[in-house]
Amino acid sequence: MIDGHIHFHKQPYTLEIIDLMVEEALKNDVTTLYLLDHTHKFYEFLFLYDNLSGDETLGWFKKKIHVPISEYLEFIKLVKSKEYPVEIKFGLEVCYMYEYEDRLKEELAKYDFDFLIGSVHQIKGIGYDLCVEVWEGQDTDEFYKEYYYKTRRLIESNLFDILGHPDCITAYEIYPSFPLKPYLEEIAMLLKKHNMKTENNTKRGGLKHEFLEILKAHNIPIHLSSDAHRYYEVGRDFKDYIDITFGKNE
């Protein structure tokens, strides 16, 4: 079983952290780890965040610690030189911004990661999932339309292997005035067309039932993801999501 979304976050790039992640994986019957960090951690990708706006979002970004991506790449080489009882893959979670797509493509071409997750974390420069307060005064319909537009552009960019937490926008149970099903159907069809996978992210309560059923109907590959930011969150709550995601006989 895959845990397809595990961050180092504030944890150091050390073999001790890898050992702890592997130990947690074995406890939860996880056989493959997809390890990553956000692009906002690395100097080389900070151009993606030039248009952030709103007090909450700007405050969030100012607290981030940035390092050169070479630190991560050297650590990847070290880990790949070792043997572990689980498979370990390394990648990035990219905050997709269509206005910087050409520059992003050039930067990503410099690296040879095992996988790339593309995620929509900001709408019109605002980190919509940072806290419910960021929704105050916003046009919910426009937020949703922009979210799905960015998601379409992300998939059509052909830069990514996996679409990260695809219905994260519903995290606060704030919904637009229009039905979501046509948008969800379109996302599923695009994922199919562009041979992309997606995830059932257990940190965020999992995929909503309607979206999960649409993805299944289109035979979109889905794996479980803990979205762990600490080693002890690897495989978080997977037992509660296996049947829902894969069916009782799988």
Regions found by a protein language model. Give the residues of each.
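An N-terminally biased module of ancient metal coordination in phosphate/nucleic-acid-related enzymes
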Residues: 1-98, 103, 172-173, 178-189, ...
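Alpha-helix capping and helix-coil boundary motifs
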Residues: 14, 100, 136-140, 237
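A short acidic, amphipathic alpha-helical/loop segment
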Residues: 20, 103-106, 186, 210-214, ...
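A generic secondary-structure signal
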Residues: 24, 75-79, 106-107, 150-157, ...
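Hydrophobic alpha-helix position signal
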Residues: 25, 191, 215, 243-246
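A local structural micro-motif
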Residues: 33-34, 163, 199, 223, ...
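Domain-core and long-helix interface of multi-subunit machines
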Residues: 94, 111-113, 118-218
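Mid-to-C-terminal alpha-helical segments outside catalytic/metal-binding sites
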Residues: 221, 233-250
